[in-house]
Amino acid sequence: MQQLNKTLIRQRFGRQLHGYNRHAFIQKKMAGHLADMVSASLASSEVGRLFEIGVGSAALTDALLHRLRIDRYYANDLVPQCRQMVETVTALHGVDSAEFLDGDIEALREIPGDLDVIVSGATVQWLEDLPGFFHRMAGALKPGGVLAFSTFGHDNMQEIRALESVGLHYHTLAEMQAMAGELYEVTGMEEERHQLDFTGPEAVLRHISRTGVNGLDGRAWTKSRHRAFIDRYRRAFSSGDGVRLTYHTMYCCFRKCPASAGVEATCC
């Protein structure tokens, strides 16, 4: 499986950030679906304090603010250029107070506390200690607060994995529920598979590149390796007049249990 290189992740996302939403149509669909789940889990559309982790191009920010009125919006990302994206979107929606926290969420010494909602769109697959993340977020949430996130499943980009033997390790819904343990109760868990059709393997590679971080490793793409990949992809994954690429999307919505009120986190 692919080893996480967060410096490389930051560089690749940073290079593609401003054109991301034009190509990341699955991620945009995920943002809308996750925002719907969050909205459905809340008793009111009025939210006091919300923290978004992995804000990226602010597609989820925009989707949430179309559904909720949020008094205090905190956002975090590994890529510092995301600050401008989230500030633009929150200003357009009239958010009075927004704050951006730059850096790796697993390395930040302080995070916001007394939160009503924590959300994360297509980010937790990059975390190295998911159980630790769940525990720390429970410490930052109010009792009854919501932790909701989208991620990907084991069939995600299975075509790339089959040909290159690289890719992230994805957890199942059951595994993530077990990691959350007794800190949370589940209010919703869903998964979907999407097959995208492309004109050819070259178009698949362009799509993956333009969505920032791809499922391929950092090895150099020589002409011979590129040609072999194109030929193998076309033979193995033809679909109609082109080729296919699979996305396996997953959604979790947890509510902090009152019994976990004593969990602590380093909060600002």
Swiss-Prot record:
It is an enzyme of class 2 (transferase). InterPro entries: BioC (IPR011814), Methyltransf_11 (IPR013216), SAM-dependent_MTases_sf (IPR029063). Keywords: Biotin biosynthesis, Methyltransferase, S-adenosyl-L-methionine, Transferase. Gene3D superfamilies: Vaccinia Virus protein VP39 (3.40.50.150). GO terms for molecular function: carboxyl-O-methyltransferase activity; malonyl-CoA methyltransferase activity; S-adenosylmethionine-dependent methyltransferase activity. Pathway: Cofactor biosynthesis; biotin biosynthesis. GO terms for biological process: biotin biosynthetic process; methylation. It catalyses: malonyl-[ACP] + S-adenosyl-L-methionine = malonyl-[ACP] methyl ester + S-adenosyl-L-homocysteine. Its EC number is 2.1.1.197. Converts the free carboxyl group of a malonyl-thioester to its methyl ester by transfer of a methyl group from S-adenosyl-L-methionine (SAM). It allows to synthesize pimeloyl-ACP via the fatty acid synthetic pathway. Belongs to the methyltransferase superfamily. This is Malonyl-[acyl-carrier protein] O-methyltransferase. It comes from Prosthecochloris aestuarii (strain DSM 271 / SK 413).
